Amino acid sequence: DIVLTQSPASLAVSLGQRATISCRASKSVSTSGYSYMHWYQQKPGQPPKLLIYLASSLESGVPARFSGSGSGTDFTLNIQPVEEEDAAIYYCQHSRELPLTFGAGTKLELK
């Protein structure tokens, strides 16, 4: 199985600043020109919401302050500027092969 390691486990960011979350895969999730890494946001009592797919593509309806980058084994989610509604847990997930696996999550809090 591909193991996804997220860092940091939690972070506190002031309104208007940048939040950066990293995800490292135990082996490459990129092939044929695509990176099969995705980012989700989850708030209490709600299902995960897809933010970014294929490493850098913004899901429809997601604000442009969310962006993703990376390839191979190293990926990043950036949120800038952070808004109050962004307080949540963020997960990376790969779909390179079965089983699909998620990172352990990063909790974003507002200062």
Swiss-Prot record:
Region annotated Complementarity-determining-2, chain positions = 54-60
Where are the disulfide bridges?
C23-C92
Query: Which lineage ranks, top first, belong to the organism behind this chain?
Result: Eukaryota, Metazoa, Chordata, Craniata, Vertebrata
UniProt entry tagged with the keyword Disulfide bond: yes
> Keywords for this entry?
Adaptive immunity, Disulfide bond, Immunity, Immunoglobulin
Organism per entry: Mus musculus (Mouse)
Can you supply one Gene Ontology CC term for this chain's record?
immunoglobulin complex
Task: Outline the segment boundaries, as ranges, of region: Framework-4.
Answer: 102-111
> What does the further note read?
The PC 4285 and PC 4039 sequences are identical.
Q: Which domain of life is it from?
A: Eukaryota
The annotated region (Complementarity-determining-1) lies at 24-38
Region feature (Framework-1): 1-23
Which first-to-last residue range defines the signal peptide? none
- Renumbered to this chain, region (Framework-3) spans 61-92
Name the InterPro entries for this protein.
Ig-like_dom (IPR007110), Ig-like_dom_sf (IPR036179), Ig-like_fold (IPR013783), Ig_sub (IPR003599), Ig_V-set (IPR013106), IgV_Light_Chain (IPR050150)
Q: Where is this region: Complementarity-determining-3?
A: 93-101
Q: Does the keyword Disulfide bond apply?
A: yes
| Pfam families linked to this entry | V-set
* Region (Framework-2) residue spans: 39-53
Task: Tell me what this protein is called.
Answer: Ig kappa chain V-III region PC 2485/PC 4039
Q: Where are the transmembrane segments?
A: none
BP-aspect Gene Ontology terms: adaptive immune response; immune response
Which SMART domains does this entry report, sorted A to Z?
A: IG, IGv
